[in-house]
Amino acid sequence: KDFFDTGITWSNSLNVAQMLDKSSYSISLGNTHQDGIISSTGMDRYNVKVSADTKLTNNWSSGFTANYITTSIDKAVTSGNGLLRTVYAAPPSYDLAGIPSHVDGNQYTQNSFRGSFDNAYWAMDNNKFTEDTNRFFGNVYASYQTDFGTTNHKLNAKYMVGVDAYTTHYVDSYGYGSNTGGGRGQIENYGWTNATYNSLLTINYDWHINEDWGLNAVLGNEIIQSNRKKYYEYGTNYNFPGWNHINNATTQQTEEETWKNRTVGFFGNVSASYKNMLYLTLTGRQDYVSNMPRNNRSFFYPSISAGFILTELDALKNNVVNHAKLRVSYAEVGQAGDFLENYYSTPTYGGGFYTLTPIMYPMKGTTAYTPYYTIFDPKLKPQNTRSYEVGADVNFLDNLITFSYTYSRQNVKDLSLIHISEPTRRSYI
């Protein structure tokens, strides 16, 4: 009751939009502020969105959308030395809020109800867990449309490029005097940087052949490029109190990992219809991926589907059966795994729940490498899922009664056991 507050959330937004003769635009601003039930916790988020579209000529149009979001979160200390360990453990007879959290004249020596855990009030002032995220995503496009001066042909071509990029940074710090870090403090800085770029080209063609026949065809190309980076900094034993920073740590350890992968795909789709009664669709996609072994980086997956609407037949048009359809389909879906060439990494060792890390590299100016504990299969193939489906849909009495039946089956080929783990037995210094 004395420790917890009432959580509050405030949200504000502003939107301005206008339609012009051949253009439109929209601007949105937003903010969310949150105070947590623990006084040291909360969140602030700001977001901006801008979009615009314009018709350049009778055939050409263009537009863009851009979004930016920034989020800052102050979190409660968790894990083995969490805030609530002393809050819930203290009996009503112990005045946790009234007794000073530290010794008079020395703010880095705690008055602890439970000696193995930090005083909750002291921890709110000296231990900080934060999370900061900045994200930008958006796209820009250009499209071309024409009917070739006829009523039965239409062509629509569109090219769009987009990006989704974000960074998330975490800081988990225990101040000088905390029971975590041996009494001299500990800090972890870690996070992600991720940027995904997308290029998409589609060409859509509609042909109204005659009163009975119709045809639609789609061709396209897609390129996806993803760049990721993970970093980690760990430091212990601050030189002096009051500055929870990695540069204040006498012992430091850093790690960094980067990934890059690219997918290039070509796809097509052809659909034919007859009297709004018979439908046939063929699709196919060829993908080339970078995150597979060199000899298995391309794969093709097609599909075919057909439908027959029985109630379009004159003999079956009545007031009892409103709609009756038979459908059948076959499809393949390809899925690439995650493949890495074997490499070496710096080992890490745990010392148990209540002990410090026994060995930390670099040690006395020397680092160490061991074969990574995950072995990837050099013969890995893209996983292929084949599915078969047969079904029927029937509606009766103005859709008062409906019946639907589907039988489907899936078979997975080259199911990916992508990697196995083995004990690390060798080290190289």
Language-model segment annotations:
Residues 36, 72-73:
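A short hydrophobic/aromatic micro-motif that marks alpha-helical segments and, especially, helix-coil
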Residues 19, 30, 175-177, 408-410:
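Generic beta-structure capping elements
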Residues 4, 91-92:
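Generic secondary-structure transition motif, activating predominantly at the C-termini of alpha-helices
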